[in-house]
């Protein structure tokens, strides 16, 4: 009996009586009167009938909440505009940066001007030193040129006699006072016809420079000795032997 009563109770709870429906409708009307606006109807609208099961309705609510959560944390929804305080702060920071950059540029310009002025001073001093060096070197060069020209002045090339090997030499213009003191150089002669060992012939120290007026001419005995300032002898091997003594003696060659 008890089991049957319980089953009947469960079955009864699955159905709603008309009295319960009227009571619910009355409570809903009272609530509607509290929130109703003048343009709203006087009677409370009936509840919409939903034929879906409870599972489907709960799943719908769950999906709706998930969509709201995702929409809240989307990137486009995370971006927001700046307020007035933030914009003022950013403006102040940018202004400070511009001042610092301007000061740095001014310091660089000052350093460049100072460097250029120092460079110009150094360049002018270096140019002055170079000019002074050139002025100091020019007199020395001119002096050397004059001394070389003076040394080369009066140098005359003479051609020796053709009695032996041709020899060319440079000889300054002789001075009449020094001509008597010059040592004549020996030149090559023909092969000696004299028999015996070769000998060295030294011309006489007394060389005739000129004839003074009022003096007679001497005999030609010494003409062979003073005919040339470059006389000499050749030994048996054909080697030129220079005169070393200004005398009339003959020295035997080794």
UniProtKB/Swiss-Prot annotation:
Origin species: Mus musculus
Major place of residence: nucleus
Disordered as annotated region, ranges: 22-53, 154-198
GO CC aspect terms: nucleoplasm
Chain's role: Promotes the association of the proteasome activator complex subunit PSME3 with the 20S proteasome and regulates its activity. Inhibits PSME3-mediated degradation of some proteasome substrates, probably by affecting their diffusion rate into the catalytic chamber of the proteasome. Also inhibits the interaction of PSME3 with COIL, inhibits accumulation of PSME3 in Cajal bodies and positively regulates the number of Cajal bodies in the nucleus.
Compartmental location: Nucleus
Tissue expression per record: Expressed in skeletal muscle.
Modified residues (N-acetylmethionine): 1
Record PTM N6-acetyllysine, positions in chain: 138
Protein name from the UniProt record: PSME3-interacting protein
Summary of subunit composition and partner proteins: Interacts (via C-terminus) with both free and 20S proteasome-bound forms of the proteasome activator complex subunit PSME3/PA28G; the interaction is direct.
Biological process according to GO: negative regulation of proteasomal protein catabolic process; negative regulation of protein binding
Record PTM: Phosphorylation by CK2 stabilizes the interaction with PSME3.
Residue spans of biased composition, Low complexity class: 188-198
Presence of keyword Phosphoprotein: yes
Keywords: Acetylation, Nucleus, Phosphoprotein
Region (Interaction with PSME3): 201-254
């Amino acid at each position: 009996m008890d089991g049957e009563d319980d089953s009947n109770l469960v079955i009864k709870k699955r159905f709603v009586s008309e009295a319960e429906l009227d009571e619910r409708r009355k409570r809903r009307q009272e609530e509607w009167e509290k929130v109703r606006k003048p343009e709203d109807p006087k009677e409370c609208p009936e509840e919409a009938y939903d034929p879906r099961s409870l599972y489907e309705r709960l799943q719908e609510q769950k999906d709706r909440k998930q969509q709201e959560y995702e929409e809240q944390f989307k990137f486009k929804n995370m971006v927001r505009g700046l307020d007035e305080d933030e914009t003022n702060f950013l403006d102040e920071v940018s202004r400070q940066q511009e001042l610092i950059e301007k000061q740095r540029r001014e310091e660089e310009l000052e350093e460049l001007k100072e460097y250029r002025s120092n460079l110009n001073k150094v360049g002018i001093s270096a140019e002055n030193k170079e000019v002074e060096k050139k002025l100091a070197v020019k007199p020395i060069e001119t002096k050397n040129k004059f001394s070389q020209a003076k040394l080369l002045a009066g140098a005359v090339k003479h051609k020796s006699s053709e009695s032996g090997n041709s020899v060319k030499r440079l000889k300054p213009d002789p001075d009449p006072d020094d001509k008597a003191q010059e040592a004549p150089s020996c030149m090559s002669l023909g092969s000696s016809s004299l028999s015996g060992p070769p000998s060295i012939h030294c011309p006489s120290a007394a060389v005739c420079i000129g004839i003074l007026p009022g003096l007679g001419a001497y005999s030609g005995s010494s003409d062979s000795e003073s005919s040339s300032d470059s006389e000499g002898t050749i030994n048996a091997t054909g080697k030129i032997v220079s005169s070393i003594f200004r005398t009339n003696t003959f020295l035997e060659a080794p």
